[in-house]
């Protein structure tokens, strides 16, 4: 799989890095199977023996800066997958059929900013990350977009034998074809 990385160090404790790669994606044996599975009284899963492998293109750009206790990272990425194997659903009589096909394309634009301060006096550190993922699923019979904003905040305090750590995450959802999956909002205090 071809991969390209360009890294340039800038004056003032910062750098810019560009990465790009191309990779293959092949259908799974389960997706290629012509077998029909009854999920429940309303749903059927059906394989597709006509699926074809496809290419995935990914590129990202990072800018990072650090000075003393201050740190920042700005990151952006673009993913493009023409002929991606994605799900599609349709009605067949009184059943909903889920199957897979080589769809038109899948794209994702992503951006993220991380800011960190610390450690202050080797005891206290704060970090915040905010970002967005914008998904575009272009199927043979559908076209969907979905945008997911997310953030992560962390604080830690250490003094002698005592440690305190707090973390908060909002969910990071993934959108592929006609399926939205994701996590939960969490908080941790240790």
Predicted regions and their residues:
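Structural signature of Gram-negative outer-membrane beta-barrels, strongest in the C-terminal barrel
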Residues: 1-81, 165-167, 173, 188-190
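Short low-complexity stretches enriched in small and charged residues
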Residues: 27-31, 121-124, 159
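A generic membrane alpha-helix/interface feature
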Residues: 30, 37-39, 86, 93-95, ...
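C-terminal beta-barrel architecture of Gram-negative outer-membrane proteins
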Residues: 130-137, 145-190
